[in-house]
Amino acid sequence: GVDSIEHGSYLNEDPDLLRMMADKGIFFVPTFVVFIFHREVGTPEAQAEAGDFRQHHVESVQKALAAGVKVVAGTDAGGWVHGNNAQELECLVDAGMTPMQALVAGTGWAAECCGLEKQVGTVQKGKFADLVVVDGDPLKDIRVLQDKTRIKLVMKEGKVYSNLLSEQTAG
């Protein structure tokens, strides 16, 4: 069966499909960053169409959430520069999700969509300790996650890869 629908540009036009997705636990991964890519570096035709497609996507996200579909943050392998995943969270907020919903879309629901919810996606005993600590409150401004100067600690599987917190407290 189908586990997720990627892109889903015109899901907003089929409420029955959205209800079925919710009933069957099928995730929706809108990949807004693809439209940013086409708008910024696409052909003139792609640039012209990006705005219209984006509006369909916004409506698709809103209707999917209203139908009970889990919307997941994702990018497009090969279709966008990697390392900008936090930009997708901003796009989800711009589409009507709360910052908390966008964070869940990029963590817990994303892990569930990939079948990894027992290992990652939430901070729980027995799961890998994957954490990012930022200087700011992403629940007030999701864009703090995109500002690399505000990332103060990165931990993957319990191992600290970057720790600027100790520098702040030592000074």
Provide a role label for each language-model segment:
Residues 53-137:
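His/Asp/Glu-enriched, well-ordered alpha-helical/loop segment
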Residues 1, 19-21, 43-44, 86-89, ...:
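Short, glycine/charged-enriched secondary-structure capping and boundary segments
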